[in-house]
Amino acid sequence: MEKKKAMQIEGYPIEGLSIGGHETCIIFPSLRIAFDIGRCPHRAISQDFLFISHSHMDHIGGLPMYVATRGLYKMKPPTIIVPASIKETVESLFEVHRKLDSSELKHNLVGLDIGEEFIIRKDLKVKAFKTFHVIQSQGYVVYSTKYKLKKEYIGLSGNEIKNLKVSGVEITDSIITPEVAFTGDTTSDFVVDETNADALKAKVLVMESTFLDDSVSVEHARDYGHIHISEIVNHAEKFENKAILLIHFSARYTVKEIEDAVSALPPPLEGRVFALTQGF
């Protein structure tokens, strides 16, 4: 069977599956990050960092398998970031599986509250942002950090710059850029929450759009903690992202119906919205 080529958006290869109620796992292999784990698709196993948005089974069900398979392959223990409110319960989940599986299931579990940051490396960090689902949930923004020589030191020799550094002078400015945002499951309320500005400025926004047509009302979508595509149109001017990847479509839709709904999006969304249809 021919391997399907990864989708590439704004320079980021993106892989994964997302079918509403069935499974969601979005993978950014160049960042070594997966968002949610679904049923643990094979490509997720090689990602060192896993960010969980909420504890519904279609988003967290494959968690023990993710850790167990990394152990089987003798990979380093992964780092798993979960909402702080469910950290203790996730710890209990692993204790049960250790007893069942008679294995260590080594991993690093981190509880992150909304607004808190997790440092992946010097030039990459992730912050949790507020989302609105029927249970405790949160999204994540990935930021890159670049260091630029301050204007007043441009033109100095290498030795002069080295001497300044040695003497403790801060010679660079930090340029922090929101690169990728992931919503998990949420209503459209996350769009109008003022604290979520960076999610709407990230180069790539991965957001749910569970419902696409008039057979389901906006009210129904909101009642179940989800987004109807018409709400994305209504908030179109708020999205400053270079690209938006829609995920988590209801299993009731076909690939053609999904693609038709996306291609019908008006400006300013037209041409910068993509759909993840793997598995449909």
UniProtKB/Swiss-Prot annotation:
The UniProt keywords, alphabetically, are: Calcium, Cytoplasm, Endonuclease, Hydrolase, Magnesium, Manganese, Metal-binding, Nuclease, tRNA processing, Zinc
| Note accompanying the cofactor annotation | Besides the tightly bound Zn(2+) ion, TRZ1 requires additional Ca(2+), Mn(2+) or Mg(2+) for pre-tRNA processing, while bpNPP hydrolysis occurs without addition of metal ions but is stimulated 2- to 3-fold when free Mn(2+) or Zn(2+) ions are added.
- What outcome follows a substitution of residue 58 to A? Loss of catalytic activity, but no effect on dimerization and tRNA binding
Cofactor field:
Zn(2+); Ca(2+); Mn(2+); Mg(2+)
UniProt cross-references to CDD domains, sorted A to Z:
RNaseZ_MBL-fold
What InterPro entries would the database entry show?
Metallo-B-lactamas, RibonucZ/Hydroxyglut_hydro
SUPFAM superfamilies attached here? Metallo-hydrolase/oxidoreductase
Subunit and partners: Homodimer.
Name of the protein this chain belongs to = tRNase Z TRZ1
Q: What organism is the protein native to? A: Arabidopsis thaliana (Mouse-ear cress)
Organism classification? Eukaryota, Viridiplantae, Streptophyta, Embryophyta, Tracheophyta
